[in-house]
């Protein structure tokens, strides 16, 4: 049977008598194939990806069978350190496990959890993300200014070693009401318990959604019990804007007490400061002018991160481990993000580095700041 024929044979609506069969969504062949293509994106040059793709049909059928029979076993994690934006231990799983993660998260977990998430919860959400979160903060600051001018305060919070402090039993307890099928719970519990307790691996796709869920009760507490109108969170980085400094001090105490039973605590970067100082969020420093305009400035460390990344790309390109097109896409994505702020000079410096590193194979794709963004506003 051809692969197309097999897809047609295995394709299903995953619905029985009006009941959605969530676990079948995970191991269904067509969904696993879609998950493979998502896991492969940007990683085709890696040997592990190539090895899996050589025997694609066999590997996908084996995964489907193992998940269906519950004989699926996670491969051993590969642990390494990353130093940007801060030092962290990342636990990366094998390519076949990444395929399972995509199928689990994209076809089941995100669908089951999204109704519980607060609107201003931006990480790992379809239709949300960093741009959405930045625009919401920008809008909040404009609205606050119209009501109170610059006379406001910000409580900026960050949780100490967030991923490493999430207790497994607490996570399972808040997950259970949203996961109706025992088979799906089996897979989730297996993944959660695959590392030491407390803590979940940063490298897993499922960990991102689970980490978003873990603080969802805190989101509702801040919005509904504390009554904070201007609030946003991206993973464990969140802010509260209010006109009363003393009330934010009380909020800080209440948030600390709310987190304590979970085994979590706010880190030393948590602070209360005047709104006129501006807010660091998602790589930008956003502040209000005296006339109520917002100004965005990208943080300088973003330049250093991209500079190191481009130099690494040059080495990978020389070894034939990455394509010229993928480098260009990555750089243009960073530049599009950077150009949202008042940082055209910084981007020009990065253009010079980019063109110097890839000048021999960059003649047809180089885009300058002027041609890419003639109409971009620096002040909003």
Could you describe each region identified by the protein language model?
Residues 2-6, 93, 98, 102, ...:
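Right-hand nucleic-acid polymerase module
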């Amino acid at each position: 049977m051809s692969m197309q024929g097999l897809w047609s044979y295995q394709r299903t609506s995953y619905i029985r008598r009006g009941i959605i069969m969530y676990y079948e969504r995970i191991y269904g062949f067509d969904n696993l194939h879609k998950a493979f293509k998502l896991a492969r994106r940007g990683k085709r040059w890696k040997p592990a990806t190539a090895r899996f793709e050589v025997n694609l049909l066999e590997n996908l059928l084996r995964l489907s069978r193992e998940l269906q029979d519950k004989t699926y076993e996670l491969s051993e994690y590969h642990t390494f350190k990353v130093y940007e934006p801060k030092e962290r231990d990342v636990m990366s799983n094998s390519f076949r496990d990444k395929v399972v993660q995509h199928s689990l998260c994209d076809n089941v977990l995100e669908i089951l959890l999204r109704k519980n998430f607060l609107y201003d919860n931006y990480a790992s959400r379809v239709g949300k993300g960093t741009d959405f979160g930045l625009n919401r903060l920008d809008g909040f600051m404009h609205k606050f200014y119209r009501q109170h001018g610059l006379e406001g305060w910000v409580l900026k919070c960050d949780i100490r070693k967030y991923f490493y402090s999430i207790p497994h039993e607490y996570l399972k307890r808040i997950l259970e009401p949203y996961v109706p099928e025992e088979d799906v719970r089996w897979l989730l519990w297996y993944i959660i318990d695959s590392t030491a307790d407390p803590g979940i691996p940063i490298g897993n796709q499922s960990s991102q959604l689970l980490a978003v869920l873990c603080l969802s009760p805190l989101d509702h507490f801040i919005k509904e019990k504390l009554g904070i109108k201007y609030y946003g969170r991206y993973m464990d980085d969140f802010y509260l804007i209010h006109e009363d400094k003393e009330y934010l001090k009380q909020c800080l105490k209440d948030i600390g007490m709310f987190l304590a039973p979970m085994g979590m605590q706010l880190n030393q970067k948590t602070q209360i400061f005047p709104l006129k100082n501006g807010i660091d969020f998602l790589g930008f420093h956003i502040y209000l002018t005296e006339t109520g305009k917002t100004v965005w400035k990208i943080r300088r460390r973003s330049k250093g991160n991209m500079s190191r990344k481009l130099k690494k790309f040059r080495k990978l390109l020389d070894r034939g481990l990455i394509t010229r097109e993928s480098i260009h896409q990555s750089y243009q994505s960073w530049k599009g993000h950077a150009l949202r702020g008042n940082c055209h000079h910084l981007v020009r410096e990065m253009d010079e580095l980019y063109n110097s590193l890839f000048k021999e194979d960059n003649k047809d794709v180089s885009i300058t700041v002027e041609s890419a963004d003639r109409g971009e506003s620096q002040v909003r």
